[in-house]
Design a protein with these regions (language model features):
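Short, solvent-exposed loop/turn segments at the edges of extracellular beta-sandwich modules
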Residues: 113-115, 470
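A structural motif
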Residues: 50-54, 68, 93-95, 106-111, ...
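Kelch-like beta-propeller repeat domains
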Residues: 125-483
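Ser/Thr- and Asn-enriched, surface-exposed coil loops between beta-strands
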Residues: 46, 86-94
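Surface-exposed, short loops/turns at beta-strand junctions within beta-sandwich domains
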Residues: 99-104
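C-terminal motif of bacterial Sec signal peptides marking the signal peptidase cleavage site
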Residues: 15-17
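Bacterial N-terminal signal peptides that target proteins for export
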Residues: 1-10
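Beta-strand/beta-sandwich contexts
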Residues: 19-70, 75-81, 115-133, 139
């Protein structure tokens, strides 16, 4: 899997770039790196693609006599490979983490005939092991109250000792009314969750929103981390909002206060959202009247955590809501969902539930989706499914729960497939027996939430939280399961 790392150029850097190079004669002074992978404290695995933004790199590698270097704390020096001439420009360099760089904090710098850039800390991380075919679920700390339609996000917050935290935001209780509650729990060394703690409540009740966390490792925020709650449903019947809330996080994980940032172009609930290279991407969902939409947008995260303007991207092939959404490498994926008009709390399987998987690649040089747009994969989900979740890592995806033909017996509660380097997917298989949440007392569920996270040892875990009960739709689950 190739993961691209992009350094984003500020307006000040762009102005500095004007006249910062003498063209074919090479740089007039030392290069300057502004950001890597859109992040303040970037990280990546061996072989990960590194995209460096800044200025005065020289118009080409040969003209600049340039190199990108990883330097280790032990004094080692590893020079990266620039695959093509187009990967080195005066403002941006694309390369990969070289084989042999040790795991841990290293420094990255650019050297040219004009000098050497100030080193940037770049942490090499081990590739996570994620094999959904061998999943075995374990119950961990349950929610204080049963919920469905809640948003879940996880992040490792920086500090002397980094803290991994899981957030549960909003959602609907047994009355189906949205809630304003915000809960968080820290992750133990073994991957279990600690007690759920209450945090500052949302400015207004919300359900069926999307949530993501910006940290210095995935965005250009300086020092602090931020929790975003995007869109959502403000009533039990599905009235979407365009509001984007932003919560400032303490080092221990608590939300210390809420504000708002740039609203979505249109109200939507049950959408998908991810952060990649300092940018938030959102897709699909349900708009006015609960009709599914196909829109896709992106907004760049600023150093103070605020979002820039939302920019339209190539739309999904057709409208889609209540779907699985995520990113693997540089590809966005949308799996299953419903293309019709469905209320959030409807427990029946719609005739417009879908089984297809679509994907689109992000151009790391611009942050936009490539001109190709979305491609429908040849491999489909085992069944049409909606109101499910999808968690992706290390070239695999795990699809959990939802409404599908056979959901009352948990026939295909868990399914998994491979995500290939070119974006395509391999065929999906089902996990049964001891590999299901129902087998450990979790019941059959939909309108739940799921996320992936790392424990302190670097092990990757998948978490499934709450949800509606398929067999008794008025029942909300408190159960939380991980593996």
């Amino acid at each position: 899997m190739r993961v691209r790392i992009v350094m984003r150029l500020s307006a000040a850097a762009l102005l500095a770039a004007c006249g910062g190079s003498t063209g074919p004669t090479g740089p007039s002074g030392p290069p300057a790196v502004t950001v890597v992978n859109g992040a303040t404290l970037p990280s990546g695995t061996i072989g990960a693609t590194v995209v460096i933004e800044g200025h005065n790199f020289g118009t080409s590698q040969s003209v600049a006599s340039g190199h990108v270097v990883f330097s280790t704390t032990a004094g080692g020096r590893d020079t990266t490979v620039i695959a093509s001439a187009a990967d080195w420009t005066n403002l941006l360099i694309v390369t990969t983490v070289p084989v042999g760089v040790p795991v841990g904090p290293d420094t990255l710098f650019v050297e040219t005939s004009g000098g050497t850039s100030t080193p940037i800390i770049f942490t090499i991380v081990a590739k996570v092991a994620f094999s959904p075919s061998t999943v075995s679920w374990i119950a961990t700390t349950g929610l204080p109250v049963g919920l469905s339609g809640h948003a879940v996000a996880a992040a490792t917050l920086p500090g002397v000792t980094p803290t991994s935290v899981v957030y549960v935001v909003g959602g609907a209780d047994s009355t189906n009314a949205p809630r304003d509650s915000v809960l968080y729990a820290t992750v133990s060394n073994s991957g279990t969750l600690g007690a759920w703690n209450k945090s500052a409540v949302l400015p207004a009740p919300i359900a069926y929103a999307a949530a993501v966390v910006a940290t210095p490792s995935n965005s250009p925020v300086m020092g602090s981390s931020y929790l975003y709650v995007i869109g959502g449903d403000s009533t039990a019947s599905g009235k979407p909002v365009a509001t984007v809330y932003i919560g400032l996080l303490s080092a221990g994980g608590a939300v210390t206060g809420w504000g708002t940032t740039t609203s979505l172009p249109a109200p939507v609930h049950s959408l998908g959202a991810v952060i990649f290279n300092g940018t938030v991407y959102v897709a699909g969902g349900s708009g006015s009247g609960n009709a599914a939409v196909a829109t896709v947008y992106r907004a760049v995260i600023q150093s103070d955590g605020s979002l820039g303007a939302w920019q339209a991207q190539p739309s999904l092939p057709f409208a889609r809501s209540y779907f699985g959404f995520g990113i693997n490498g540089t590809f966005l994926y949308a799996l299953g969902g419903d293309s019709g008009t469905v209320t959030p709390n409807d427990s029946s399987l719609s005739a417009k539930a879908i089984s297809d998987v679509v994907y689109a690649e992000i151009d790391v040089r611009t942050g936009n989706l490539t001109a190709t747009g979305w491609t429908s994969g040849a491999a489909k989900l085992i069944k049409a499914v909606t109101k499910h979740t999808a968690v992706m890592a290390s070239g695999n995806v795990l699809v959990s729960g939802g409404l599908y033909n056979g959901a009352t017996t948990g026939a295909t509660e868990e399914s998994y497939g491979g995500l290939n380097p070119d974006g395509s997917t391999s065929s999906f298989s089902g996990a049964t027996g001891s590999h299901t949440i129902a087998s450990v007392g979790g019941g059959n569920f939909f309108n739940h939430a799921a996320t992936g996270y790392l424990d302190a040892t670097g092990a990757f875990h998948v978490l499934v939280v709450g949800g509606d009960d398929v067999n008794t739709p008025t029942k909300k689950h408190k159960g939380v399961f991980y593996y």
